[in-house]
Amino acid sequence: NGKRCRNSDILNEKDVVSLYINDEFFEYSKNNLELVKNIINISVSPEIVYEDENIIVVYKPEGMDVHRGSEKAKATLIDIIKAYLYRNGEYDPEKENSFSPAVCNRLDRNTTGLVIAAKNAASLREINEFIRERKVIKKYLCICAGNFPANHGIETAYHKKGQHNLVNIRKSMADGYKQIVTEYKIIEVKGNFALAEINLITGRTHQIRAHLAFIGAPILGDGKYGNVTVNKRYGIYRQQLCAYSIEFDIDSDCRLGYLAGKKLFAPKAGFTFGGFSIK
């Protein structure tokens, strides 16, 4: 009615409500519509490892981002998943305003392996809760250039995010540092290289890459924490790291209880360094 209203005002019949919306809202809507069109037009299909009405587990290749970043034209893993669900009639971004399919676990661009995505909000909440409670057991394979302290062990250290998207690791506690625990098991050794299975007992940014480098067994090809000289000598410029298995260690009496005990494996490790018999 031409007057500024308060939160407590109650509308009456024939009242006129005027909305004053920032121009940035319309610019965002325009960009969002363009993004929707890009997703709809993606023809690439995800490499599906497991799927049901609630979740989809896919294999992420190296060089692909999980989420959209600065490279607007490049399809991300979640874009490809959304496009696949759109083609199957399970998701329509132009009609769905309350929920968008979302990934539950993230991998670095050059890490390969299994990624879980939820098809609905209830499943997203439950999977995220499982992950927080360490009920989703994720194991990794990696090729390391260096020597592990033993064939099998559990290493503890302290972790802090640093500058330039790097993390710092130290042996003793200090201000701002949080404890990390990493379990490793050597599967095979060839010369100065080892194929290892890693179990994250805690899960922090770059934990595997930074912690293994700290104990003297950096991941081959890792440009942030690895041995640059060795990487260059063998021509390996992306980390040889794969999230190769997921196990649902959950109770069977919850909404996603049918997943209890289910174990999934990546179809391949995707390593560019050969020589190891990876199954």
Question: What do these predicted ranges mean?
Answer:
Residues N1-G2, I215:
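Short strand-turn-strand beta-turns centered on an Asx-Gly dipeptide
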Residues G2-Q163, T272-F276:
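RNA pseudouridine synthases
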Residues R6-I10, E197, R238:
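Short, surface-exposed secondary-structure edge patches
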Residues S8, K185-I186:
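Beta-strand-rich interaction surfaces with strong enrichment in secreted/lumenal proteins
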Residues D23-E24, N41-P46, H164, N168-I169, ...:
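Pseudouridine synthases involved in rRNA/tRNA modification
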